[in-house]
């Protein structure tokens, strides 16, 4: 007698959902939380570069440009942009003295 005949194979009825009371508030809440988590995870993976660049560079104000000549401001902006674009997987921030 082979082992395959000894193993219990589930029938199709056992694979179907047994939760007839799906209107339970806990089940509904868990489903909503699970769906929201999945959506947020997908958005995070799709837009993580934009999101983290915004948090790292957009929310933090740089040094004041008041009284600085326009040419120096443009040079600083180009250096900051090239530092961010230097490595696609890691952000680099150069502090100018």
Swiss-Prot record:
A lipid is attached at residue 50 (S-palmitoyl cysteine). When the channel is activated, one or more imidazole moieties of His-37 probably become bi-protonated. Forms a proton-selective ion channel that is necessary for the efficient release of the viral genome during virus entry. After attaching to the cell surface, the virion enters the cell by endocytosis. Acidification of the endosome triggers M2 ion channel activity. Belongs to the influenza viruses matrix protein M2 family. The keyword Ligase does not apply. The record marks 37 as: Essential for channel activity, possibly by being protonated during channel activation, and by forming the channel gate and the selective filter. The keyword Hydrolase does not apply. It comes from the Viruses. Residues 1-22 are virion surface. It holds the Pfam family Flu_M2. Its main location: virion. This is Matrix protein 2. It is a single-pass type III membrane protein. Residues 60-85 are annotated as: Disordered.
């Amino acid at each position: 007698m082979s082992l395959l005949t000894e193993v219990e194979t589930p029938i199709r009825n056992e694979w179907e959902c047994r939760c007839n009371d799906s209107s339970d508030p806990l089940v509904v809440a868990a489903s909503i939380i699970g769906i929201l988590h999945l959506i947020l995870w997908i958005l995070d993976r799709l837009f993580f570069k934009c999101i983290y660049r915004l948090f790292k560079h957009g929310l933090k104000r740089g040094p004041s440009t008041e009284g600085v000549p326009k040419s120096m401001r443009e040079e600083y902006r180009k250096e900051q942009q090239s530092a961010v674009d230097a490595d696609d997987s890691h952000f680099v921030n150069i502090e100018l003295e």
